[in-house]
Amino acid sequence: MTEIKVPDLEQKALALLQADADKIYKLIDVQMENLTMPQCPLYEEVLDTQMFGLSREVEYAVRLGLISDDIGREIMGSLERKLAHLHELFNQR
């Protein structure tokens, strides 16, 4: 049986969380392109659901010791900043 080293798991967890954050950004970007107003209930529900799911993933990885709390906050904060910027761009149209 192959033993998995902890740093490998840490890197994999970080990569998976970042990939999920990128998927959320792309999903919201596509929704924004197809909406006439960002206050659409469907848009808000999708955003809230996706962000909640990612926050649970991050918390789980932190609790397992795969990532630090600071890295988890950075993943969430970075995505929130990107989405806020996307929202600003949409409102400038």
UniProtKB/Swiss-Prot annotation:
Disulfide bonds: none annotated. Pfam families: DUF1507. InterPro entries: UPF0358, UPF0358_sf. SUPFAM superfamilies: EF2458-like (SSF140404). Belongs to the UPF0358 family. This is UPF0358 protein BBR47_22520. It comes from Brevibacillus brevis (strain 47 / JCM 6285 / NBRC 100599).
